[in-house]
Every structure is written in structure tokens, then in C-alpha cells.
Regions:
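ABC-family P-loop ATPase nucleotide-binding domain
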Residues: 1-8, 294-333
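ABC transporter nucleotide-binding domains
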Residues: 2-4, 9-188, 193-207, 213
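Short, flexible turn/loop "capping" segments at secondary-structure junctions
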Residues: 52, 220-222, 247
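Conserved beta-strand-loop-alpha-helix hinge in the C-terminal portion
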Residues: 210-230
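Short, charged/small-residue-rich alpha-helical element at the C-terminal edge
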Residues: 225-294, 299
Length: 333
């Protein structure tokens, strides 16, 4: 679906993206993770032909970008940072105008498709209000709706949960999983590690413009070679395991072992009652922080995906049951 080969982008003497090669397969939920300023947005813009690469090759849906972008853009839904909209028009009218401008737009189905897109992102019931009264989170939902008006094969999203509160983030995550299960390939960029971990099946990590990691989430969160064991007789267990115990906390042990079943059998044979046994797995946080050397705050770990409300924000009028309170924001006349 997306392939880049040694893509580099320079702005003057600054390399924003350096020799990046990614591979997004059909059916993926691919998360491009990196701290702010790592080159994520620049790469996303290059995928859509909005920014030209200095060198390298980009293929999207089998076509070279930007040369043949017009062939594939009708099959791509995209949300790039804060979406643009006419502030004096309603969200519904903005979507209708956007759809009408598309080269393959079908007028007779437009109303139904707009209704469905608004419903899916939680804006039904407030879609006739002027966009200038929308909060940041509501504008983000509208931008996602614009990417769904014409059913896409591929969604390319840059920070799609920007401005959303925790409930809004969960709603959008559930929507993206549902779309993916219906056959839509998802590519998104984010600096929020918890959200990428909760949503994506494969990830790439950008650091200072370079791709430092690309792997499936399952492989990254594989076994560590350690087993957590809760037993009734820690002294006998320690003696039985003969140097394999790395840590003891009361009746709980951390044991070096690649074979939990054999470990359990060995303890039982020695007369140690095993209350619980669990394979210790690496967290995505540990892996990403190891390869980037960044602090956890650079990836939204401390905030766990929360988003602050705009300064001075006040909730708009009632009538938006699908949008959570912190997501509704201000009416900026």
C-alpha cells in the first residue's frame, strides 16, 4: 500500500527526513511514532504529494508519488494536522462542498455519505452549526469525517487524536479499528506512544528524521526470557532454581527461563506450590525509549494520551450526545 525507498527531504541545509524506507502492507494499522520535530509530518506530506522529496522513491497504491498522485488520491482519505474548513459554514455544508469538488463524486449518494460520515465521527446533531463554533476536538472530528465521505482504500492520518479528550480518543480508536476490519488500511503518525500501542499492529519509529525501528507490535512485545512466579516456599524455590532467580519480593520471584512449562514442573517436583506464573514481556515503551534515547514525556507516556482543553474554553449549546464534554470547547464569535 505504501513503500518508500531511501526518501530524504532537505529544507536548505536541514535534513528533515533522512533515507527513510518504510513498508505498509494491505490491512495494516501502521503507526509512525516519533517525538515532535522528528520528521513525521514532513513524511506524511510527501506521501500525499504535498511536499516533494529531495531524493528517493515513494509508491502509494502502486503509483509513484508525486508524479501519479492524481491517480490514487481519490482512493485515499487524509487528515493532515488541523483540517481546513470554511468557518462561517456548517460542518455538513463543508463536507458537501468538499465531496462536490472531488473528480469522482456521485451527487445522488452525497447526502447519505455525508450523513454516515458525520454519524461515524460523532458529529450528528451538531453538524448544522458554523464551524467557527467548533472546538479543536470537534474540528478534528470534522477533518476525519472529510476523509470518510468517499469510502477510502487507505487512510493517511497525521496526529488524528489531536485536541480530543480520553473519551474522544477511544471513540476514534474504535472507529479506526472498525474501518480496518472492513478492509481499510490505516497509516497514522503520532507522538503518543499509548495510543499507537493501543491501536496499531505495526509501527515505525522516527528519530531526528531517521527510521530507527520498524516491526510488528507482537514481535516488539515478545518474551524477555524472564518469568514472574508466585510460590508458597521462596527459600526452597531459590535453592531449587540454582542461580536463575534475578529478584525476590516476598513470595514473588523473577526467574530467568525460556520454558515456563519446564520451570513449573521443576518447582512442583521439588515440592513448591506454584500459585501463579506469567511470562514477562517487553513493553513498547521500553523498546521505543531504548532505540531513541528520548524521555517518556516526548511520547505522551506521562499524560497517557490526555489532551488539554483550549484556554478559556466553554462548552457549546446542548445537542451533541456523541461528543464528550471536554471535547466541545468554545464558541469563538
Amino acid at each position: 500500500m505504501i513503500t518508500t525507498r531511501n526518501v530524504t527531504k532537505r529544507f536548505g541545509h536541514v535534513e528533515a527526513v533522512r533515507s527513510v524506507s518504510i513498508d505498509v502492507r494491505e490491512g495494516d494499522r501502521y503507526g509512525l511514532l516519533g517525538p515532535n520535530g522528528s520528521g513525521k509530518s514532513t513524511l506524511v506530506r510527501m506521501l500525499l504529494g504535498l511536499v516533494y522529496a529531495t531524493s528517493g522513491e515513494i509508491l502509494v497504491l502502486g503509483e509513484r508519488i508525486p508524479r501519479h498522485a492524481s491517480r490514487v488520491l481519490p482512493e485515499i482519505g487524509a487528515l493532515i494536522e488541523e483540517p481546513a474548513a470554511y468557518p462561517h459554514l456548517s460542518g455538513r455544508t463543508n463536507l458537501r462542498l468538499l465531496d462536490a469538488a472531488g473528480p469522482n463524486s456521485v451527487r445522488r449518494t452525497r447526502r447519505l455519505r455525508v450523513d454516515e460520515a458525520l454519524e461515524r465521527v460523532g458529529l450528528a446533531g451538531i453538524d448544522r452549526r458554523p464551524v467557527r463554533t467548533y472546538s479543536l476536538g470537534m474540528r478534528q472530528r470534522l477533518g476525519l469525517a472529510s476523509a470518510l465521505v468517499r469510502p477510502p482504500r487507505l487512510l493517511i492520518l497525521d496526529e488524528p487524536t489531536n485536541g480530543l479528550d480520553p473519551r474522544g480518543i477511544r471513540d476514534i480508536r474504535d472507529l479506526l479499528v472498525s474501518l480496518n476490519e472492513s478492509g481499510v488500511t490505516i497509516f497514522l503518525s503520532s507522538h503518543l506512544l499509548p495510543e499507537v500501542s493501543a491501536l496499531c499492529t505495526r509501527i515505525g519509529v522516527l528519530d531526528s528524521g531517521q527510521l530507527v525501528l520498524q516491526e510488528s507490535l507482537a514481535a516488539l512485545q515478545g518474551p524477555t526470557g524472564r518469568v514472574l512466579v508466585s510460590i508458597d516456599d521462596p527459600e526452597r524455590a531459590v535453592a531449587t532454581l540454582d542461580g536463575q532467580v534475578e529478584h525476590r519480593d516476598g513470595q514473588d520471584l523473577v526467574v530467568r527461563s525460556s520454558d515456563p512449562a519446564a520451570l513449573n514442573a521443576r518447582l512442583v517436583k521439588a515440592g513448591v506450590r506454584v500459585h501463579a506464573l506469567a511470562v514477562q514481556r517487553r513493553s513498547l515503551e521500553e523498546v521505543v525509549l531504548d532505540v531513541t534515547g528520548s524521555g517518556s514525556d516526548q511520547f505522551g507516556v506521562a499524560a497517557a494520551g490526555t489532551a488539554a482543553a483550549p484556554p478559556g474554553a466553554a462548552p457549546p449549546a446542548d445537542g451533541a450526545p456523541a461528543v464528550s464534554a471536554n471535547d466541545q470547547g468554545t464558541a469563538d464569535e
